[in-house]
Amino acid sequence: MANSTGLQFTVKVGALPDTTFAVVDFELSEALNQPFALSLNLASSLPGIDFGAVLDQPCELLVWYEGELQRRVSGIVSRFAQGDTGFRRTRYQAEVRPALWRLGLRTNARIFQTQKPDAIIGTLLEEAGITDFAFALRHEHAVREYCVQYRESDLAFINRLAAEEGLFYFHEFEAGKHRVVFADDAGALTKGPELFFNLATQGLSEGAYVRRFRYAEAVSTAEVALKDYSFKTPAYGLLHNKMSSELDHQRETYQHFDYPGRFKQDPSGKAFTGYRLDALRAGAMTGEGESNAAELMPGSSFTLTEHPNPAFNLAWQVVAVTHSGQQPQALEEESGGEPTTLSNSFEVVKGTTTWRAAMPYKPMVDGPQIATVVGPAGEEIYCDEFGRIKLQFPWDRYGASDDQSSCWVRVSQGWAGGQYGLIAIPRIGHEVVVSFLEGDPDQPIVTGRTFHATNPSPYPLPASKTRTSLRTSTHKGAGFNELRFEDQAGQEEVFIHAQKDMNTVVLNNRSTSVNASHTENVGGDQTVVVQHNQTVSVKENQVTEIQGEQTVAVTQNRNTTVNDNESLQVKNNIAIQSQSGDILIATAGGFIAIDKDGNISITGKGLVLNGTRIDLN
């Protein structure tokens, strides 16, 4: 079907014969970081082609010149339509997209942990059945501890992740297949042809050429400053600045500051700042034009020659291009003898400039979420040195509710200071309320806890609605510690329960006032040690009952004063002994004295001795 211009367009779709369709015209739109879009207007002698043989099937467009292949584009048919039928031909229309486009039809919410961005992207591509992809990376990209795809398509997530990491992608084509390539530097691009500048309209006989070229500069951001925060280094200012080196024609005062910068370490902060500056200045120095070079495509460059302005005769990197081709001969009854033509319009930046995409919208979590505390099998409490825990979110279909389900997540406490405050680690199986810093799904933080049907409150409700309780549960055992307050009128109570030991340390004074009765029951031993004096005052009676032995040891003096009577009743023996001193028993009118040498003195008004037998020696 080639005519005087030497151009010819052919197309092959799925398993259909090569002659099934003739190309009437096409438009191919390609750009960095975008799946290409090929719109084909076709003609066929078949009036009823099976849609199943076309839709979602491979499709390849070939551009020929004088029988030599100039360009190929292959993808899958995303839309197919049948139009009017003429005398000999039926019109059809097909939309062709790359396999990458399919990822825009897959929406998901999932968590990636401790992976580099290229590994995350590779996983998504492989899951979509795309195995023909490559990474041409020249810069180091840090492992992402926690990266969430949140309620966005796989394609949107890839675009966002690529933009954050300074990556861009484009397509390469081989016979019957296409490859998506991810790069992070202009040095990875394919060097393209030389194209001479020519204002005249002519064919390809002298080679492809550029027939229009316009260069523009725009005042843009001059400097980027990004700041973030890490709780691991709270006093360190994670602030990074990057100034453009191409500010000869504008002021340097246009600073772009943003917080948070989406980084937690200096190497990432430095790189992200540079990526952001490149993206914001992507339109600072640009070119656009028209040509008839079919080989122009994103991911490649061309060298412009013979332009009247020598400053433009250099390498240019293709950012976007739209090819248009017309082949009227495909409609034999309507062609009118018009020639086959091919032209394009393109957008470029300088070949040494690394183009980067603008930062896309990042999905935000609209409000708090519910999650379950998880950990390794056989454990009840699982945390790290910062008291962080692992979570399983209800929307995460990939997590196994174990210690790999999430990153370590910080927990808000009621009070947090330097080695003081309140701490209660949520335990495995607990339900918690999770908020997200700045709404960022990559930055969860536990801000609350809730009971639910299988984790009820310590006391049944609403029957115990007047109780305020702090009850714990013995770790890997049965039991609890508890501090409880009862506020029911007439039943007010403060209750303390210690499952095992209870220790109280008072560094100064302690006062206890009981207005009614006080009962203490000690099931084992009791020891009271008073370093100084002790005073016990009982205003009424005191009863002491000892069912075993009692031993009283007084290191110095002991004085007992009884203002009324004193009785001592002993069923067996009484022994009173002074080891080195005297013994004196006295009343108001006399006394009996025994000195340490054994001398006994009895002094009084009289002495009465009665007994069955009295021996005096």
Curated annotation (Swiss-Prot):
Entries under Pfam families matching the protein: Gp5_trimer_C, Phage_base_V, Phage_GPD
Organism expressing this protein natively: Dickeya dadantii (strain 3937)
Cysteine pairs bridged by disulfides in the record: none
InterPro entries: Gp5/Vgr_OB, Gp5_Vgr_C, T6SS_RhsGE_Vgr_subset, T6SS_Vgr_RhsGE, T6SS_VgrG/RHS, Vgr_OB-fold_dom_sf
Lineage: Bacteria, Pseudomonadati, Pseudomonadota, Gammaproteobacteria, Enterobacterales
Name of the featured protein: Putative type VI secretion system protein VgrGA
Positions of region (Disordered): 325-344, 449-469
Gene3D superfamilies the record matches: 2.30.110.50, 4.10.220.110, Baseplate protein-like domains, Gp5 N-terminal domain
Entry superkingdom: Bacteria
Family: Belongs to the VgrG protein family.
Disruption phenotype: A double vgrGA-vgrGB deletion inhibits the ability of RhsB to inhibit cell growth.
Classification via SUPFAM superfamilies: gp5 N-terminal domain-like (SSF69255), Phage fibre proteins (SSF69349), Phage tail proteins (SSF69279)
Entry function: A Vgr protein that is probably part of a type VI secretion system (T6SS). May be required for export of proteins involved in Rhs-mediated cellular contact-dependent growth inhibition (CDI).
